[in-house]
Amino acid sequence: SFGLISRTGILKQSSKLDQVGVFGKTVEDVALFAKTLIKKDILDEDTIHYAADEMLEVCKKGPIFEPKFIFYKTQSWKKISKGSQKAFEFLLKEFKKNIEVFDEPSYFKDIPKYHQIIHETDMANSFQDFYKKSKKKMGKKLVEAIERGLKYSAKDYVDAVDFMKQSYKSYSEVFEDYYGVITPASLGVADKGLLSTGSP
């Protein structure tokens, strides 16, 4: 939803990475919800004008042609929980006519590194007042991330942003032939309790 749904009023971490997620029971519910939220906002300079009025109607019509998706088993596949692996293997088997399995592009291995630089640098900037005034009240992992963010050089950050832009540009062609990409978003189900949300 980056550039489509405004982040105004939401705690800012990174203007380059922050985006609002939309959830619903059905695809139609998500379309109706998103249609309402998609607006140009002068307070969020990343938002753009986007015609979403017919989103629900288009969604109800279904796909124009048989949907095709790409599935990547990334370098982190071996770290993923057995339960999650089984779930994805089942998905691939059930929808094998719609999902093609590919090796990830070589530059994918650098994404976590550059993402971390952008995220932590922006977070250090966004949370600097909290860090200065209430460091002892903040979580250990958050403090460590902010302190790493304070140490990256300007070149580190510029290189990371350039990598992100080039990656988007290189990968955009994929969506001319495929509806989307399927890949695990985390290593598994979040830990029980409120102490942790699991692996980032």
Label each region the model flagged.
Residues 2-85:
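A short helix-breaking turn/cap at a secondary-structure junction
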Residues 42-48, 97-106:
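Flexible, glycine/charged-enriched surface loops at secondary-structure junctions
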Residues 47, 115, 158-159, 188-200:
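Short, surface-exposed loop/helix-turn segments at secondary-structure junctions
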Residues 54-56, 80-104, 127-133, 157, ...:
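Acyltransferase
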Residues 82-84, 111-121, 192-198:
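Short glycine/threonine-rich loop-to-helix capping motif typified by GTGT followed
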